[in-house]
Amino acid sequence: MSEDLKQIAQETESLRKVAFFGIAVSTIATLTAIIAVPMLYNYMQHVQSSLQSEVEFCQHRSNGLWDEYKRFQGVSGVEGRIKRDAYHRSLGVSGASRKARRQSYGNDAAVGGFGGSSGGSCCSCGSGAAGPAGSPGQDGAPGNDGAPGAPGNPGQDASEDQTAGPDSFCFDCPAGPPGPSGAPGQKGPSGAPGAPGQSGGAALPGPPGPAGPPGPAGQPGSNGNAGAPGAPGQVVDVPGTPGPAGPPGSPGPAGAPGQPGQAGSSQPGGPGPQGDAGAPGAPGAPGQAGAPGQDGESGSEGACDHCPPPRTAPGY
């Protein structure tokens, strides 16, 4: 029995360790999913925004270089060969500049000999015609604030009879768009405790529960103190029915010879006490039927003279 209990305790301990390990892993995974995933998404969005800003800046600088190149080309009067328009379409060049470059593309054959003829012959570089214009790009980031302007001219002097009054500016400032929701604030302090509620009335006593099972037998108690002596008993003479005669006892041993008695008186003594009733004798033989006798006289009332005297204890 003890070995089974030890085995059960070991299995319980091992299961408890497994359950604790599983709960710990689940908690760590849940916290990682709640904290790490939003942080990773925010970081990726930040990287994407940064790359988008850098790409837009590169496109802006490229457009500026092309504008400088065109300006220099117009000033010098020399028109050189411009690269394919398909390459600049991926860099975000505007449709107007692409149109201008496509118009001057065929005229470059007289200078460099690299352009195709206007008669519809194939281009020497093996590139096809420019494709359709792409969709407009995303809006760029807002630029920096400009330099402060020059101070304004001084206002006119007020007249002598004019009194000073409060400034009356009249600006029509439309409401701006709502900003993004801020981070939730910290939990506020606990409020003051409320007033104590009304005390309930006196509850009514419930019904008596069912009788419980009988308890185990208690230990026997110690002996009590001795009681006071009872009142002396009273002898009640109740005539009892004579019991059956006992068996005759065995004869006792012969006694020692007694002392010689005194000379008796000439007068006989009185009758001794009546002895106990003897055993009933055996029934005699049935006699002959006698002649009916004469009616006797009425007998006297019955008495107890036929009963032996009661034997009482000494002192009664």
Swiss-Prot record:
Give a GO molecular function annotation for the protein. structural constituent of cuticle
One of its Pfam families is Collagen
Keywords for this protein: Collagen, Cuticle, Disulfide bond, Repeat, Signal
* Disulfide-bonded cysteines: none
Q: Which residues form the signal peptide?
A: 1-36
| Low complexity: compositionally biased ranges | 127-157, 183-204, 219-234, 256-266, 276-295
Gene Ontology CC annotations of this record = collagen trimer
Q: Which family does it belong to?
A: Belongs to the cuticular collagen family.
Name used for this protein in its record: Cuticle collagen 13
